[in-house]
Amino acid sequence: MTKRALISVSDKSGIVDFAKELKNLGWDIISTGGTKVALDNAGVETIAIDDVTGFPEMMDGRVKTLHPNIHGGLLARRDADSHLQAAKDNNIELIDLVVVNLYPFKETILRPDITYDLAVENIDIGGPSMLRSAAKNHASVTVVVDPADYATVLGELADAGQTTFETRQRLAAKVFRHTAAYDALIAEYFTTQVGEAKPEKLTITYDLKQAMRYGENPQQDADFYQKALPTDYSIASAKQLNGKELSFNNIRDADAAIRIIRDFKDRPTVVVLKHMNPCGIGQADDIETAWDYAYEADPVSIFGGIVVLNREVDAATAKKMHPIFLEIIIAPSYSEEALAILTNKKKNLRILELPFDAQAASEVEAEYTGVVGGLLVQNQDVVAENPSDWQVVTDRQPTEQEATALEFAWKAIKYVKSNGIIITNDHMTLGLGAGQTNRVGSVKIAIEQAKDHLDGAVLASDAFFPFADNIEEIAAAGIKAIIQPGGSVRDQDSIDAANKHGLTMIFTGVRHFRH
């Protein structure tokens, strides 16, 4: 009995050659619509779908393959006599191979001129149905959704006249992943259209971006996936201009870096990170000076760090960066001379180019945190804060210079691991206390780091001070200005201590925990 294949594809790459080889192997080919036209024009003889169903394609192509003569031919178990008899009684011929890929829903909704009606029309119904029927019956039917699998299938058919069960099972699994991802995108689109903020089911889909050597540690397996609807301002979308493949830890650090730099749009700014904590932030009127400040903030921790700059990297800045061992540099662009300097004898230095004009769109994405047996979802900590809404709670008001420095410190503290303390002046960070289990411990660490640069320095805390001992430590170090959220039941104790030492202190009313 001649074997039959059904081919209906929107992505026609490689399909003509595939179909020609099938014909050479003695297969009959059923086809639909544009696929049939393409194959016929290439001289590949095909059977029209309506010759199989007895019904013409109708309703602008919405109905063409949803028919028992198709799905019966796909779903009939070859090892079940009752199935084969039912097929014979109803003149249903078996279909042994399905090659289908789906309407380009993803590509459609990414179009700038997308309309709701156009999106709806690009929801494939018949394609997923055929794929699922064939995949369910993979014991007997081979199903192909990816042109990358054409060669494997043809090779096995040529060698043995059929594919192996292992291949059919692997291809079926691929189909179910594919249709699940396809439906997830449709669900995501409609959920957005109706404004549902807390859907009762959450299905998200990502595409494999990079198979990684290992994860956070060598004993951990890891891979990097990118959103099926890519975010332009994302490490996954960055263009790598030089260097080794990004590691798991590189990607996490780089992601933290591009989040931080979003908050420093107004002036040229450089941020240096280690282990997802900023160890140096500098801002100035030009990017070279901003680099100087970021480097001076912690010239020890910068070794092996990640650097992000919010302006084009020029030659002068590149010359200063080049001698230092860095893991990654990220910037919106690089001058030709700067790139030549940075790559000279630095084949491993990872240099990434990222369009910063897409920053705002990245801020609306939800954050997902995996826990054992569950998933936490929250919006990003990107609340717009207006300093005019802040409250000076002490007798002394901040000076103009202190006010500027406090605003700078408040931007920086958002990205320090809790309990987080940061000491800055108005243009660079000076000391950092991160990740301590008590706040006074973070205060002491930050002061120790900044001890030689405390003249005119200010201090920011990501959350309230639970006790006045923090204020005593700060005052003893000579720091005169503090910014914190407030909100402790003992706030008045901290205010009284600040007044006793002549400090100025601002309450913002907004906490910035980071775990």
Swiss-Prot record:
Residues 1-145 form the MGS-like domain. Its EC number is 2.1.2.3, 3.5.4.10. InterPro entries: AICAR_Tfase_dup_dom_sf, Cytidine_deaminase-like, MGS-like_dom, MGS-like_dom_sf, PurH-like. GO terms for molecular function: IMP cyclohydrolase activity; phosphoribosylaminoimidazolecarboxamide formyltransferase activity. Pathway: Purine metabolism; IMP biosynthesis via de novo pathway; 5-formamido-1-(5-phospho-D-ribosyl)imidazole-4-carboxamide from 5-amino-1-(5-phospho-D-ribosyl)imidazole-4-carboxamide (10-formyl THF route): step 1/1; Purine metabolism; IMP biosynthesis via de novo pathway; IMP from 5-formamido-1-(5-phospho-D-ribosyl)imidazole-4-carboxamide: step 1/1. It catalyses: (6R)-10-formyltetrahydrofolate + 5-amino-1-(5-phospho-beta-D-ribosyl)imidazole-4-carboxamide = 5-formamido-1-(5-phospho-D-ribosyl)imidazole-4-carboxamide + (6S)-5,6,7,8-tetrahydrofolate; IMP + H2O = 5-formamido-1-(5-phospho-D-ribosyl)imidazole-4-carboxamide. It comes from the Bacteria. GO terms for biological process: 'de novo' IMP biosynthetic process. One of its GO terms (cellular component) is cytosol. Keywords: Hydrolase, Multifunctional enzyme, Purine biosynthesis, Transferase. Belongs to the PurH family. The IMP cyclohydrolase activity resides in the N-terminal region. This is Bifunctional purine biosynthesis protein PurH.
